[in-house]
C-alpha cells in the first residue's frame, strides 16, 4: 500500500511540472514518427526495449478524448506493430496499458512536432520519459534545447537522449 501511495504521489508531482496542452484532431490525425526519446531508465527505451516506440500514426477520437497511437517496437530485430488508445482524464492526462500502465500528456506542440511526457508503471517500478514525435526527421537547434530543458525539469539525465530516426527500420 505504501508503494502504491508513493507512486501516486510521484505521478502527481511529475504532472504538476507543466500545464497539459489540449490537442485537436486537425493537429494530430496523420502519420508521425518518433524523433527522440529520453528516459530516466534507459533499459526500457534502448534498442530492443519494450518502450522504444517507433510511431507510425496518431488519430484522435471523440474530439481527442481518445488518442490512438499506432507504433512499432523492434524485438529481436523484428518489427511488431502495436495499437494503444489513450483515454483522456479531467486533468488532461491520457492513460493506456502497454508494458504496464502509462500516463502521458502533451508538453509542447507545433504544426509538425509534439513533445510528450510519459510515466510508465509496471511490476518492476516507475519510469518516466519524454518522447518527441514529428512529421519530419529531426529537430532544429531550439527544439533540441527545449528537449534538454524538459528532461532536466523531470530529472531525466540528458545523456540518456536517443535519436530514434537512424534506428527506425520498421517505417521504411
UniProtKB/Swiss-Prot annotation:
Cellular component annotations (GO), alphabetically ordered: extracellular space
Primary location: secreted
Cellular location(s): Secreted
Example GO biological process: sensory perception of smell
GO molecular function term, any single one: small molecule binding
Family designation: Belongs to the calycin superfamily. Lipocalin family.
Protein's job: This protein is found in nasal epithelium and it binds a wide variety of chemical odorants.
Protein name: Odorant-binding protein
Organism in which the protein naturally occurs: Rattus norvegicus (Rat)
Gene assigned in the entry: Obp1f
Amino acid at each position: 500500500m505504501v508503494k502504491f501511495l508513493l507512486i501516486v504521489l510521484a505521478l502527481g508531482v511529475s504532472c504538476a511540472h507543466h500545464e497539459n496542452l489540449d490537442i485537436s484532431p486537425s493537429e494530430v490525425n496523420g502519420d508521425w514518427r518518433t524523433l527522440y526519446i529520453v528516459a530516466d531508465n534507459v533499459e526500457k527505451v534502448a534498442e530492443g526495449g519494450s518502450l522504444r516506440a517507433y510511431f507510425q500514426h496518431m488519430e484522435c477520437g471523440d474530439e481527442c478524448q481518445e488518442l490512438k497511437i499506432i507504433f512499432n517496437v523492434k524485438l529481436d530485430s523484428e518489427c511488431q506493430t502495436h495499437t494503444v488508445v489513450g483515454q483522456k482524464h479531467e486533468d488532461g492526462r491520457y492513460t493506456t496499458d502497454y508494458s504496464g500502465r502509462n500516463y502521458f500528456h502533451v508538453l509542447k506542440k507545433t504544426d509538425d512536432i509534439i513533445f510528450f511526457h510519459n510515466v510508465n508503471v509496471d511490476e518492476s517500478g516507475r519510469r518516466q520519459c519524454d518522447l518527441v514525435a514529428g512529421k519530419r526527421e529531426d529537430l532544429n537547434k531550439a527544439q533540441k534545447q527545449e528537449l534538454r530543458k524538459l528532461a532536466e525539469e523531470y530529472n531525466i539525465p540528458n545523456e540518456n537522449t536517443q535519436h530514434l530516426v537512424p534506428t527506425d527500420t520498421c517505417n521504411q
